[in-house]
């Protein structure tokens, strides 16, 4: 029989860190800390499978699960000496989510569960502090009404702010017991008026309401969005943790906080974190009050005049420091820890591997290798490949005179410039229109996740380094400044009030997430140097990986950038991109509109020196590294004007009648150009195009070899081949031109002719095509289109719906479909090598920079992946991780 509930407490636990898939990250680590003998409030964890059962039961909690939870609560009662629902020494509970990977702020929590009109009196009596009891009760009502009953926070906050204004209070901590009791009555009245029901007084009703709400939050809009952004499977579900409450709001000897064993922004080996006196944990995480530094060094560096925990609570600080060191050594990774101090006693509420900036991840991994804590291979595995994008963020030029209009905390490194927007929705709209924006919020909430993802940067006027905005921005690699108390956001009038300046929506600002500064206007930036810790990690990765990493580059500038990122060749040069530039488009149109072959050849003679110059530049930059050049691929109509205005403009420039040009454009029109007259089909229809391109390639190879002294071995790729006979025809053209150029130059040129495998038929007939092809490069963009029968340009109309409804887990145009497209690649690779055992195999679609797709390429033995220049470091790291993981 399935066990639904696992207990922990009093130094014993029924699970541990190894059980994170079943117990979720929070539950597994609570059990682990308990078994280590650390001070953990007793509790129980409902396994994540129960979440899926909850959904399959139509949102009903199983009776057997209820029975196991009741038994678990009885065990908590035995340890604490308190009783759930009792009017004497009542046991209060927290109910928290716990997915197997951290999803900060995306799911729901309920604290102080078990309070009602009677137990609040008992709690006040036991604690000797009626104010604390009523404060806890109002927190519970507000949280429960929001999470379980669906009544948002705003109305409650409005009541509280009105009451504080009437009483002349600025802070929540200034309210007395009687005043909190009145707030509670107002909260309960609001619930009755808005929902037509009373706030539940039965603790068990409260319990099952909270458990159901936590399960339900797994499918909340914000959680679904977060999982899609971070590729977390829908089917995992969340565990639920029910734990005895400990209180950080029991006066000035109590506190709550979050600590990192190392700095999550810089990676510095020093305790780092924030705390609030007389508060509960949600106050820190939600950014409702700006917290104080845990350490004295942290206080001094932030310029705060608020006392640190190190000075204010020295005994608790010493114990926290000891536990942090123990946990980091136990888990062999930087830890993110939540704690509460209840009247001087420290309690550990959570530990997990902390989210960190990529720069911090690099430093922590390198330092831990130097400290002999982890191996070089483990260090390589510690870096999320896609997070390397963070290192490519520009930084503000240090020579620039900064006009600082606000300062805050440096929550996520990098700099960003954009127009001010005040809502997440505006950020999403701006991204869709191609505009760069900075999202301004007093504090972000999980509902802002879509806007945070769309923005170039994030600025909040409240919150600390562990607030929602800070944690999420670091995870996304978005520059972020939080707690900018020198600024004020006027939400109603859409204004930002800074130091000596008032800005409105649409005005440009720059934020420096590394320095915590807000600057007026656009500021010059510089690209970072990828050295130091990055260089060491990538060096270890390069030693470990088997596959080479090439780049998709069409210009010498792209090639230079890619080489600086470690590219070992060009896996795809799209020659058609060269024809769209400047005057070339006019010559290309002249060729297309020519009446006969003679006219086409005259135009191609003009294009030849242009192409030769392009290829010479690429060969020179790559200095003997392999360069794969794809012959002209798109249909000819793509080079022609489309609208009547464009037709008139082009006709005038070319000395043609608009009507004649329109007729030629219409004649070239295709109903389905993706599957039409393109690729090798164009080459066969107009072999003179192939002849020109081949001559440009070989003449450029001669020129570059003379210039660099390095042998140039062009790899010429024929696109959209489905038949061996197609490749034979085009290859014969290429070979003939190669012979002519070699004779003219008086030198031998080594070269390869291969094909893109981008049609299912080509994959299935790879053993036959390999008789003529010397290499295969899998064009995964078109292979995905032709395998699924989905146009990539139209997929956005329904792929997100498919993901949301669980039809597919990932967008197949972003991460390779292993079962279908991947199977075709495997078949083609095996059959191709059966014919030609030394055949070179690679991929050159967008998937070449996707870590999951790269792991697949390693598994089936491809020789290289090729991706855009800025994804080369990602591919290098992912290729290494694929080898290391396979060998572990």
Which residues fall in each region the model found?
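Extended, non-globular alpha-helical segments
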Residues: 407-447, 498-536
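Nucleotide/phosphate-binding sheet-loop regions of phosphoryl- and nucleotidyl-transfer enzymes
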Residues: 1-400, 410, 429, 435-438, ...
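Conserved alpha/beta-domain cores
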Residues: 96-97, 530-532, 540-888
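Intrinsically disordered, low-complexity regulatory segments
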Residues: 423-425, 486-487, 535-538, 554-556
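Glycine-rich phosphate/ribose-binding loops and adjacent secondary-structure elements
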Residues: 345-347, 438, 445-453, 467-471, ...
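Short, ordered loop/turn segments at secondary-structure junctions
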Residues: 45, 49, 444, 463-465, ...
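Structural motif
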Residues: 241, 421, 438-440, 459, ...
């Amino acid at each position: 029989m399935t066990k639904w509930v696992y207990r922990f407490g009093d130094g014993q636990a029924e699970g541990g860190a190894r059980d994170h898939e079943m117990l979720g990250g929070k539950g597994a680590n609570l059990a682990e800390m308990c078994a280590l003998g650390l001070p953990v409030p007793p509790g129980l964890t409902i396994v994540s499978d129960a979440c899926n059962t909850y959904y399959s039961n139509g949102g009903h909690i199983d009776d057997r699960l209820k029975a196991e939870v009741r038994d678990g609560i009885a065990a908590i009662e035995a340890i604490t000496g308190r009783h759930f629902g009792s009017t004497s020494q009542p046991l209060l509970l927290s109910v928290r989510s716990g997915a197997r990977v951290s999803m900060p702020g995306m799911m729901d929590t309920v604290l102080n569960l078990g309070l009602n009109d009677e137990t609040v009196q008992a709690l006040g009596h036991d604690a000797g502090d009626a104010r604390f009891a009523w404060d806890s009760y109002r927190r519970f009502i507000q949280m429960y009404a929001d999470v379980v009953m669906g009544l948002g926070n705003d109305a409650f906050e409005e009541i509280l702010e009105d009451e504080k204004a009437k009483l002349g209070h600025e802070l929540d901590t200034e309210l007395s017991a009687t005043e909190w009791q009145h707030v509670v009555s107002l909260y309960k009245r609001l619930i009755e008026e808005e929902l037509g029901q009373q706030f539940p007084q039965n603790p068990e009703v409260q319990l099952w309401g909270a458990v159901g709400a936590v399960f339900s939050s797994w499918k909340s809009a914000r959680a679904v969005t977060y999982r899609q952004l971070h590729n977390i499977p829908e089917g995992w579900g969340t565990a639920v943790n029910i734990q005895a409450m400990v209180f950080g709001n029991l006066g000035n000897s109590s506190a709550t906080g979050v600590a990192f064993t190392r700095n999550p922004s810089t990676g510095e080996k020093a305790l780092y974190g924030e705390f609030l006196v007389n508060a509960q944990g949600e106050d820190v995480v939600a950014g409702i009050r700006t917290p104080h530094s845990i350490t004295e060094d942290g206080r001094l560096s932030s310029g705060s005049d608020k006392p640190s925990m190190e000075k204010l609570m020295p005994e608790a600080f010493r114990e926290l420091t000891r536990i942090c060191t123990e946990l980091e050594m136990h888990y062999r990774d930087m830890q993110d820890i939540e704690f509460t101090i209840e009247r001087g006693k420290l309690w550990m509420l959570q530990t997990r591997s902390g989210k960190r900036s990529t720069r911090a991840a690099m430093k922590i991994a390198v330092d831990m290798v130097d400290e002999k804590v982890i191996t070089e291979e483990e260090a390589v595995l510690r870096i999320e490949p896609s997070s390397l994008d963070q290192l490519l963020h520009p930084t503000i030029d240090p020579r620039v005179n900064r006009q600082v209009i606000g300062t805050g905390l440096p929550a996520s490194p990098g700099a960003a410039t954009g127009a001010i927007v005040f809502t997440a929705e505006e950020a999403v709209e701006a991204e869709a229109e191609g505009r760069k924006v900075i999202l301004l919020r007093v504090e972000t909430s999980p509902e802002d996740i879509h806007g945070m993802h769309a923005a170039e940067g994030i600025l909040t006027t409240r919150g600390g380094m562990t607030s929602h905005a800070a944690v999420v921005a670091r995870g996304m690699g978005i520059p972020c400044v939080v707690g900018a108390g020198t600024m004020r956001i006027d939400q109603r009038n859409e204004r930002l009030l800074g130091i000596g300046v008032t800005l409105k929506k649409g005005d440009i600002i720059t934020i420096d997430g590394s320095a915590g500064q807000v600057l007026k206007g656009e500021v010059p930036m510089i690209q970072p140097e990828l050295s130091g810790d990055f260089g060491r990690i990538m060096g270890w990765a390069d030693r470990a990986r088997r596959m080479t990493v090439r780049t998709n580059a069409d210009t010498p500038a792209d090639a230079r950038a890619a080489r600086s990122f470690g590219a070992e060749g060009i896996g795809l040069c799209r020659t058609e991109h060269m024809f769209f530039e400047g005057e070339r488009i006019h010559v290309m149109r002249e060729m297309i509109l020519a009446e006969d072959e003679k006219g086409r050849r005259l135009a191609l003679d003009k294009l030849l020196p242009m192409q030769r110059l392009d290829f010479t530049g690429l060969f020179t930059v790559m200095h003997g590294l392999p360069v794969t050049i794809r012959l002209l691929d798109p249909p000819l109509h793509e080079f022609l004007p489309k609208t009547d205005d464009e037709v008139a403009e082009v006709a005038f420039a070319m000395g043609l009648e608009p009507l004649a040009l329109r007729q030629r454009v219409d004649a070239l029109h295709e109903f389905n150009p993706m599957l039409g007259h393109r690729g090798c089909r164009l080459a066969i229809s107009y072999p003179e195009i192939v002849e020109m391109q081949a001559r440009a390639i070989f003449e450029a190879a001669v020129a570059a070899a003379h210039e660099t002294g390095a042998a140039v071995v062009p790899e010429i790729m024929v696109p959209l081949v489905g038949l061996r006979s197609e490749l034979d025809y085009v290859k014969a053209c290429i070979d003939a031109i190669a012979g002519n150029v070699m004779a003219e130059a008086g030198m031998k040129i080594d070269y390869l002719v291969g094909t893109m495998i981008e049609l299912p038929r080509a994959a299935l007939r790879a053993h036959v095509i390999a008789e003529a092809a010397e290499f295969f490069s899998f064009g995964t963009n078109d292979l995905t289109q032709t395998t699924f029968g989905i146009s990539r340009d139209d997929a956005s109309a329904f792929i997100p719906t498919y993901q949301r409804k669980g039809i597919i887990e990932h967008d197949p145009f972003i991460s390779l479909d292993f079962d279908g497209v991947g199977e075709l690649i495997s078949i083609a690779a095996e059959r191709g090598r059966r014919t030609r055992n030394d055949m070179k195999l690679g991929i050159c679609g967008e998937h070449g920079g996707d870590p999951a797709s790269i792991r697949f390429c390693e598994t089936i033995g491809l020789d290289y992946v090729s991706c855009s220049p800025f994804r080369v470091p990602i591919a290098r790291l992912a290729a290494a991780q694929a080898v290391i993981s396979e060998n572990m």
